[in-house]
Amino acid sequence: MIKLKNFAELNSQEIKLIFKWRNHPDISQFMKTKHIDFEEHLRFIRNLHQDSNKKYFLVFQDEQIIGVIDFVNITTKSCEFGLYAIPDLKGVGQVLMNEIKKYAFEILKVDTLKAYVFKDNHKALKLYQQNHFTIYDEDKDFYYVCLKQSHCKALPS
C-alpha cells in the first residue's frame, strides 16, 4: 500500500532524513542546486505551508519510505514534477511515477505533466519514456518532457 505524507506534516526525524538524502551525491548530482545547508532546508519546508503552487510528499510503500515526489508551478492546466528514490534503494522508480501520475491527474486534475531531465540522467529519461512522456524541447543541459492526460493509460488504483 502506498501512502503520501505532505512535507508540511513531517516529523523532525523525517526532515533530517530528507535533508541527508537530498544532499547525497547520487541525488544531488541531478538537482539544479547541488548542495543545501540545513537552515535552507528548514526554511524551504516552512515556506511550503504558504505556497499553494508547490506540493512535496514523502512516499511510503508498506510503511517503508521509498522516496520523494513533488509538484511545482501548479496551474489548472499543468504542473511540473520531480522525484527521487532514497539512496541505494532500487526498483521503485515506476512506483513513484505511478503516484505522480495519479496525484497530478486525479487530485490536481491537470491536463499536462511536465519535467526537465539532465541530459546525462539516462535512468530518469528511460523511465519517463517508458511512461509515454515525450521530449518537447531541449537546451545544452536538459531535455524537457511532458505527458498529456489523454495519452495516459488507465492508472492503477
Swiss-Prot record:
Pfam families: Acetyltransf_3. Its EC number is 2.3.1.-. Residues 5-152 form the N-acetyltransferase domain. Keywords: Acyltransferase, Transferase. SUPFAM superfamilies: Acyl-CoA N-acyltransferases (Nat). GO terms for molecular function: acyltransferase activity, transferring groups other than amino-acyl groups. This is Acetyltransferase PseH. It comes from Campylobacter jejuni subsp. jejuni serotype O:2 (strain ATCC 700819 / NCTC 11168).
